[in-house]
């Protein structure tokens, strides 16, 4: 974001131009910033180690006091521009995956702990009410070493504020350090909740049981070329984990919003397996629509089970979401990707047939408008439409416009005036359907 430079005599120059453009836009969209304080401005860095195509510097600061001054000025600027009430609703996360030494942090574990403490105290010195935390830890450390335990012990013993704990999780097995397997193992779907529960136990043991837990990176794969990211599989994947972690975490942040992404070079295909909810051309993937359908749920939970959830809103309207999650098969889970190709991406899943649900409602009073939103390989999956188009590598304007129109759930409506109503839902593998019953006046 080019926030820091220096004059010839070493006097700091702070520049918030790009920060303001970004935060102004986010706030205009109703989005609350979750601020990650990384990576290191090059003129503050102790060394020249970098990561990713855009060369983010992973070094600790050469002078901690200069970094702290930058942080204080940044916080003051945010408070002055947006007001204390607004900024108090944000979160400030210190660094990204410092447990991955030599990858995202070019210092020692002890250096990160001290860096975290100094950074948090710099923030709190300006406005104590601001929410600070971290360490945005990778999930491998959760299973393979005591990094999280030692971090929390340090915070407790040194009386360093930890307002929230953050970590990242993906499906790949976090290999032990002594293992040198080439193949990557995919864990079962229960692995996400098991990881959360394991971390919660560690937090309780360290006397941080009441601290908010945030997953600030989450997706199916940590690999930004995993071809499954574009497929219909991702819609029930998102819904399954949103439901399975309900109440266990404060926030679940999908990584990432778009395939316009500068950690690696840009592939030629419009569907190359990028992390994003939206591809580089602005086409919305099934994962995007999964979040959109979740957003339509009400605030009162009525029922939840294997493949379904029902909610209600204050006016008596109801919402029922059904999903058919199918996991990858044992061969793919073991690391064999030989059945996966750019145009053939569904032979790597367990063989499951359609799944049937039945929704029966009684004692309905008044009139309801029932709207169904169907999303599956034949209805609204833009990747599958691209395959049926012939999988062109470079999309013309006409082709792109066509795919935009074919992306998204198929919608049907009907009016319900009877006191009893029954609906059968038949979902193919990876299929999703939302039924909303809106009270009519």
Where are these regions (language model features)?
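C-terminal beta-strand-rich structural cap/linker in extracellular carbohydrate-active enzymes
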Residues: 393-441
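Noncatalytic carbohydrate-binding groove/subsite architecture in carbohydrate-active enzymes
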Residues: 109-252, 270
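Active-site-proximal loop/turn and secondary-structure-junction residues that shape catalytic pockets
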Residues: 39-41, 96-100, 136-140, 171, ...
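Acidic (Asp/Glu)-rich catalytic clusters
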Residues: 21-32, 77-86, 152-161, 205-207
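The substrate-binding groove and active-site-proximal loops of carbohydrate-active enzymes
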Residues: 2-16, 53-68, 96-113, 135-142, ...
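N-terminal substrate-binding region of glycoside hydrolase catalytic domains
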Residues: 1-76, 83, 93, 99, ...
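Aromatic/acidic polysaccharide-binding cleft in carbohydrate-active enzymes
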Residues: 215, 219-342, 376
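Carbohydrate-binding surface patches
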Residues: 306-388, 424, 429-436
